[in-house]
Regions:
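C-terminal regulatory/interaction module of P-loop NTP-utilizing enzymes
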Residues: 1-296, 350, 355
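Accessory DNA-engaging acidic/polar modules
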Residues: 291-355
């Protein structure tokens, strides 16, 4: 038992306490999570909600505030007993038992965070007795491990364990009801209110060396507009808090709201990208609305979103430089001749061509 406990540890105790994030804003269920951890009672909790809204961060920052050790385990469809409880490993030419993160957390009375648990399969059923707080029998080394005081479990998921019918969360599975029933409570995590999300973005901006309250306000209003449309079934995609933070990061690098928005939207299909960009353009007149170039007068000017390394590429294909706007531009007619090439530069209509 002593050998397995020693060789099971691969990190110092201090490194198991999450770092406190300067950009973190406490909101929603944070106080509930912190209260449960502080109580020292075993009370497994299931936290569910759409992606990128801070479920995992909330648990880890609660541990950081309380200076509690946290073992975060990222669950996949391949996660099994060997990954969770431990197994025999070849170390320095010798085969020894090494505890897995679940057993390590139990021995140390730490918080166990099962991240994206709904990606797991029946191979995780080895956790049933652990979820009951009764400890675990390690049959391969004939040892029973009882949980130390303070041990508890949190699981995060995008679904409630019933899979994803719309395909948004591909890979999630229908979880075993007996496992789900072993969680004491379920917390439903929504996206942060606009006022809270703005605070999150402002803290992110400050961490990157700038502050733009106007931009932060427009971004949160934009995300709220899209989420309302999503809830009403008008659109199939959504803007997460994580994606808003990525917009802020892009702005810090490129110093352009337009570029920051476009970079964040590139992961979506063309129709969604155009719709989301148009949503933002309604809130910020510094951003031009993307339109269907085939419906425009052929002489309409289309400004391009390019970086310095692309200037020769667009120039050689007929683009001209506008000193006032500091942008390259072509006509709608030019775009229509090779839309696949020009659309990568997000051409936006502004005015009738001066040439």
């Amino acid at each position: 038992a002593e050998l397995s406990a020693i060789r099971g540890m691969t990190a110092g105790a201090a490194s198991l306490i999450p770092d406190r994030l300067k950009t973190y804003v406490s909101w929603g269920h944070h106080d509930t999570v912190e209260t449960v951890i502080k109580s020292g009672m075993f009370a497994p909790m299931y936290v569910t909600g759409l992606s990128g809204n801070g479920k995992t961060t909330m648990v880890m920052q609660a541990c950081a505030n309380l200076k509690r050790e946290c073992f975060r385990v990222n669950i996949t469809s391949a996660t099994d007993e060997d990954d969770l409880l431990g197994g025999f490993r070849l170390i320095n030419g010798e085969t020894v038992w090494q505890d897995g993160p679940v057993v390590n957390a139990m021995r140390r009375g730490a918080v166990l965070l099962l991240d994206e648990i709904d990606l797991g399969t029946h191979l995780m059923m080895c956790l049933q007795s652990v979820l009951e707080g009764k400890g675990i029998y390690l049959k391969k080394i004939n040892e029973f491990v009882a949980p130390a005081a303070g041990f508890t479990i949190f699981a995060t998921a995008n679904t409630k364990g019933k899979g994803s019918d719309d395909g948004r969360f591909a890979g999630t599975n229908i979880m075993n009801e007996a496992m789900l029933d072993r969680f004491d409570w379920t917390l439903e995590q929504e996206y942060a209110p606009k006022s809270t999300e703005k605070k999150i973005l402002l803290k992110k901006m400050k961490s990157l060396g700038f502050e733009d309250k106007d931009f932060a306000g427009r971004l949160t209003e934009w995300a709220d507009m899209i989420r309302r449309a999503f809830r009403e079934g008008a659109i199939d995609e959504i803007i997460t808090t994580r994606r808003l933070e990525n917009v802020v990061k892009a702005f810090a690098i490129f110093q352009s709201r337009e570029t920051a928005i476009d970079m964040a939207l590139n992961r979506f299909d063309d129709d969604t990208k155009t719709a989301f960009r148009d949503f933002y353009a309604k809130l910020d007149d510094t951003i031009d609305t993307v339109v269907d170039t085939t419906t425009l007068d052929p002489s309409t000017v289309m400004y391009l979103d390019t970086n310095f390394s692309q200037k020769d590429e667009v120039k050689n294909r007929g683009a001209r430089w506008d000193d006032q706007r500091r942008k390259w531009h072509v006509t709608a007619e030019t775009v229509n001749l090779d839309p696949e090439f020009w659309n990568q530069f997000n051409p936006t209509a502004v005015e009738t061509s001066p040439f």
